[in-house]
């Protein structure tokens, strides 16, 4: 299949608004479960998931935690400006970013940008009885003929470099966000953020702050389901992929070759890689973010085997790397998943590292050959989305059968 020339219109379906799950059900593990196996579709309840999984399998979860990434500032003119955190700029490390005090910088989307022509935005608030002022300053380019400097756009022109300063060196940026930030929820929910979202829009195993969207397949898991997985002999491991707003980016081009995938940052610890080796690289992935992380590891390992002296930043997986014209020849049949993962472990050993920090822009679509993921737990995805393409690739084109069944049997979507 010529993946680049897939027409996104072939991945459309009718999704009535009332089928979109605007709010979670009271008991998250009581959601309906659709099971697709060997071409046969059936349904059950999510808390029965462990009954369908092979004993001794390895299940991979994305342990990212959604941050309160939306901040609102009101100018003296009354104009409301929204600053949406996208990616840490200084420091670039997520963990260090949330620990930093006094000053930090982010790449941000800005709502109502036309009203922010110059100067800094300020917001007064309190933390632990202390009064603080948070200021946001947009970096700008050289002044034009009119004497005004345009905002400095980065990341394809959609993000802007914003410097944040606050007048208390004892308060971390994590505490700032807790005080003034709002939790972002997907635009397709078409509603305002509510206080309850701080709990219900996080997975029970979320740990590592940084995402602006939840890995939603994981929202159905409860502590009881996790315990049942253990009781069924299912091994569990975690990776981190910081979910960006690009996950909601619609495909606007007629063919997917014209769609630019967003970059997301991943962290995979040595322990997780060793678990993959122990389980012969046979994985159950929870959610598309876990899929993109685990499958990207294969191509990182391939690159290490072909270029042993590369730096960590050179391991970034580009959008089309897995395909025929990728940097290492795309479909690399002569390198097994075990060899690729072992190459990453060897790289960590060589450099005295306990975790791989890298990034991926991988697009998984029909024509892609899955290397490591053998079973997938996922939600239903939007029409004409890259996530639906990922599912179609996994189902070898049978997504229509699955989605038609779900629509006819009262499943909740997205």
Language model: regions and residue ranges:
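Surface-exposed, charge/polar-rich loops and edge strands
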Residues: 1-142, 147-414
């Amino acid at each position: 299949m010529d993946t680049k020339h897939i027409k996104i219109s072939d991945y459309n379906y009718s999704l009535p608004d009332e089928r979109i799950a605007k709010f979670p059900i009271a008991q998250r593990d009581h959601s309906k479960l659709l099971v697709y196996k060997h071409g046969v579709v059936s349904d059950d309840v999510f808390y029965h998931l462990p009954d369908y999984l092979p004993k001794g399998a390895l299940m991979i979860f994305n342990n990212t935690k959604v941050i309160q990434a939306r901040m609102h500032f009101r100018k003296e003119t009354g104009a409301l400006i929204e600053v949406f955190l996208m990616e840490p700029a200084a420091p670039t490390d997520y963990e260090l970013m949330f620990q930093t005090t006094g000053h930090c910088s982010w790449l941000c989307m800005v709502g109502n940008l036309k009203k922010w022509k110059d100067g800094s935005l300020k917001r007064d608030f309190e933390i632990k009885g202390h009064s603080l002022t948070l200021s946001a300053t947009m970096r700008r380019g050289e002044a034009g003929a009119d004497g005004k400097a345009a905002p400095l756009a980065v990341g394809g022109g959609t993000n802007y470099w914003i410097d944040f300063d606050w007048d208390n060196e004892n308060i971390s940026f994590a505490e700032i966000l807790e005080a003034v930030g709002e939790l972002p929820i997907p635009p397709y929910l078409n509603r305002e953020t509510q206080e309850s979202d701080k709990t219900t829009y996080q997975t029970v195993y979320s740990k590592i702050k940084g995402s602006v969207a939840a890995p939603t397949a994981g929202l159905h898991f409860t502590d009881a389901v996790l315990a049942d997985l253990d009781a069924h002999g299912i091994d569990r491991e975690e990776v981190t992929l910081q979910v960006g707003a690009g996950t909601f980016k619609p495909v606007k081009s007629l063919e997917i070759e014209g769609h630019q995938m967003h970059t997301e940052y991943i962290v995979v610890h040595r322990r997780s890689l060793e678990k993959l080796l122990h389980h012969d690289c046979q994985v159950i992935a929870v959610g598309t973010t876990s899929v993109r992380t685990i499958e990207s590891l294969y191509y990182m390992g391939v690159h290490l085997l072909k270029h042993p002296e590369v730096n960590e930043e050179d391991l970034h997986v580009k959008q089309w790397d897995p395909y025929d014209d990728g940097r290492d020849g795309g479909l690399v049949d002569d390198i097994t998943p075990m060899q690729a993962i072992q190459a990453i472990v060897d790289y960590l050993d060589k450099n005295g590292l306990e975790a791989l920090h890298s990034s991926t822009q991988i697009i998984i679509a029909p024509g892609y050959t899955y290397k490591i993921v053998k079973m997938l737990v996922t939600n239903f995805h939007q029409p004409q989305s890259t996530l639906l393409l990922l599912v179609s690739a996994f189902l070898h084109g049978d997504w229509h059968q699955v989605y038609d069944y779900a629509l006819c049997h009262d499943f909740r979507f997205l």
